[in-house]
Amino acid sequence: MKIYKKNHFLKILIIFIYLSCNILKVNADGTFSTIQPSTDIKFDKSNLEFVAEWDVSANSISNVVGSTDSSEFSLNYGVWGPTYNYLIAKNKSPSIKANVDYTFSFDFKLGKALGEYNNYQSMVLSFYIPEDIAYFPWEIRTPLYTTNEFSGNFASTSYQSKILTFRSTVDIGNSIMVLRINRATETGPTASSVYFRNMKITIPSKPITTPTDLLTKDSELIVIPKPPISLDLQDLTKCPYLTASDLYNWHDPTIWPNGVVPSPNQNITIPAGKRVLISASSISQTQIYSRIVVPVNSELIFNDQNFTMNIRDIYVQGKFIMGTSLCRYNSFINIIFHGEKTLQDTIAQFYGSKGIAVASGGFISVQGKQYHNTWSKLASNVWSGDRVIWIQDNVNWEVGQQVLITTSVYKDELDNQNEILTIKAIEGKKIEFTEPIKWFKYGSQEYQSEVALLSRRIVFSSDESSSVSTSFGGHILSSGEMQFAGVQLKRMGQKNVKARYPLHYHLGGTLNNSFISDCSVTNSYYRCYTIHGTNNVTLTRNVAYDAFGHCYYLEDGVEVDNRISFNLGAYVHTIGKPAAGASQIGETFYQSSELTQPADSAASCFYITNSWNSFIGNAASGGWAGFAFPNLPKPIGNHRTLNIIPMQYPIKEWQGNTAHSSGYYFEDGASIYVGGNLTFNEANGMLIYNSGRLGRTTYVNGVKNENNVVFDRLNNTKIFLSNLGVGYWGENIEIVGYESHDNTRPVSLFGNVWLHNALVNGQSGNILTKNSETTRQGFRFYDFYVQTIISNTIFRNFIHSTAATKRDEDNVVITATTFSDVFKPQFISATKNITFQNVPQSQIIGHEDVANSGSSRLFNFLDGDGSVTSSFTGKPGIPQIVGSHVSWWKFDDSCLFSTEWNVWVCNKGTKGLANIEFWVPGFMERELEQDPDSYIGSISLFGSGINDERKTLLTRNPGITGVSNMGWYAYFTIGTPNYLRIWTAQIAFGEYIFLAIPYPTGTTFTITSEYDYSNQYTYTITKTTSALAVKQGNGKQYYFDGTHLFLKLVNFMNTGGSWESFDRVGIKIPDVYWTYIYNIRATNTAKPSVNGYFLNLPDVRPSSTL
């Protein structure tokens, strides 16, 4: 029987109904409460621990045998136990709001009559920093809050109630409840017990009122884009179940072979060339359908009706339609996938089992009711016990749907404070839940927890019986065009089975009309949304929560030109042991049956193997990282023979993405992590992943060409509650528009770096981040071979921590990597237009004097406009050179020494910063790492009126950085080498170093300069008549006065071109030039060198008048 078009009136009626259902609601669904009821936080044997100095056993706290009251428990004391013990909660306490009356209550009774050794006098209720609990009972630290010692009727053998009201004067976020129980004496010669029941903290009820401080924007500095406000346009006259005269009902026997409707246990093939409609009455809603094939030129269309379909496999070569872009279905449709774990292909060859596979040339469209926005952010703080929240965007969510509120703590996986709640009532931006919120959630101007809708009317899920124990759910795979919108995918994916993901574009090539929009993936066994070997698709406005392995997943490194926008990923778990490591090396993982993709040891919300894609308005909560950009020197998987280098592609577009609560497993972990290395071992066919440092250089079109180097650029980015906000091991990065809040450090950046228009906030108002011994730094300058410019940046709320034992480990704005004598800084760091808010002067710079460390002695940066140092110098607008604690940096009388910062600060004037290296073949070379205490002399300033000693030490590890256009006097305690090479690593065009080195009287010299890679710049340095002539010359002359050899070091390769420096906002950092060398060969027949060194030379600086 054919299904013909309905009449025009019916079409208009359907359109009206649809629009009425989908309009963004302004009227309430359900009834809002006016009073928030009280909330009880209950304690019993399961969530309390017995702690004492001695007499502790597994039986010290136990359930009461025979009791029907689950709250009842006993404390069981042995003989001669201590006079007090503690009950410590195993879980964190609710947040406690200042100046609010809470109650702590319980019932108590003695196990035997009151006596000399059975006398309980008092108790004390306290709340401690969670980390301090580890010190109990031997070291009791100061609590966040404690009550006075309280008594009660603790002398009865029948239950007596005790209610204690307590009020804190400060807000308390993370804490652990501790109850101290005090006895009059030790426990005595016989065992005894006491009993508790109904122990609880009660959060009081309160009127529900609209907060006066609702946010009107989500960020202070940056702009985070949002999706369009309007709903997608609908035309229900185009619904697939209405519009065609050639549409046949599934239950019509005339279309099937032999005139019989197939049974569920058959392999069912849709008749060739037919368009078949499934309605609720067409199929069994309880039996499991085995396999359905939709051949080429056939279509399987679902009606917009409430129903459930149980299925094992569906293979689509033609079309599978359950709603379209113009006709999104309003009905509640459940597709449940069944099947035991197997690696066999039961859908079709290469397509696995338990799911839907769409062949190349096939088409699938599943589009349910549009809920918009799919996620928002809190508009105000939420406290434990609250049931009503306000969000920042209007939504059309519905009563009974499930909502996620993401965590507001740092270590998401280790302290899960994400919450799923059910809507009781909703109106505009106001939502009431059926149950109280357990944990404090932050929603102030700095940042806000995300609030996401998990429920959808169309649900694809896996049956629990065959899925949960094996992590083997259903999967959707399409090699053709695929459109999914308004669908929830629950318990989907097949853990560690490649290509078996909840929703997956698979080897589709370049598609033209494919998208996944406003869907949700929840409780996924393996990933969330995958783009594999497919280009030009859109993932937008989706939500993902609670998934194993990388979530939004670009698989092989060849996926480009995709648009990934306005998506949320949250609570993403590594597979197996998380990648850790206490150094930049990270950890290495190998492909195995338990870790099919070894990079899942560092599972992230967004995993990006090729950067040439657009990322707009996405948010990541949790994961090993929020956004991971692993380095792939070659594609992997199906594309490993393709001749491209994925890691060389720059980011196509990055605008307004945020991340939080990640980066804590690895010392160098970050919420945005550009690092790690994923390779394919050709010998054994296995993948290898290393989580540590590997650099990348990006080029136009991903093709290596030194003339087409292109910067990665992150625009309008926000990171909070992270270890490192952005960790970038690459060579060229610009971060423009950036907010960092409550991160250990905002960034760790390598190569050419520009951080511009940033807000770095060391401490937000989030009470969950306070009372921590973790300190935070504003920016750590690296130690060598980078170029870093920070401009237009606000640093806020860096306050001294009493727990900090070193300057550079305190809550301080500027620090540097200063541990090494091998890796020493050149002129690599500069600042301009820096602002400090609530930062005491002592916390602006934290330089540490590290023993035997050249990087500590040579710490330096250019304060390009004096804005960093003006609070100390009183010289705003005047550029300053900042150098370490050694007198080497005191180059003129403008220099001031800050004891708070442990640095010298000097007017830059006409000076610059330069770096050279002394090389003695076989003794002191760049590639020969030596002990840090291998001291061989010193280098001092001379001339320019300097009469005192201003020097630093030299070691066998080459490298010295100092002020250019000055006299440098090098003295070698081991003796001056008769052959010395000097690498002019960083001497900018127009600058010089006036170098003096002692030699014995009568020494003659052969001096040349050369470029390692060309003889075009080879010069013979000739003798002139005076040291002054050398200083005023062009760098091609030397002079020896019988005591000192004078040379003017310049780099003849430099011409002043723009390519010779890293230049942003008027600040220039010269490049390190590889490798322009001066060669000095010295001969003396009267006082010859001994083993290559002229010994016992006097240490006398040249004249101060030079």
UniProtKB/Swiss-Prot annotation:
Q: In which compartments does the protein localize?
A: Secreted
* Highest rank taxon of the organism: Eukaryota
Does the record bear Secreted in its keywords? yes
Domain G8 as annotated: residue spans: 254-380
Q: Which UniProt keywords apply?
A: Glycoprotein, Secreted, Signal
- Where in the sequence does glycosylation occur per the annotation? 267, 306, 512, 536, 677, 715, 833
Example of a GO cellular component annotation carried by this entry: extracellular region
Residue ranges spanning the membrane: these are none
**Phenotype upon gene inactivation:** Shows no aggregation.
SMART domains reported in the protein's UniProt record: G8
| Gene Ontology BP annotations | aggregation involved in sorocarp development
What's the family? Belongs to the comF family.
Q: What is this protein called?
A: Communication mutant protein F
* Protein's organism: Dictyostelium discoideum (Social amoeba)
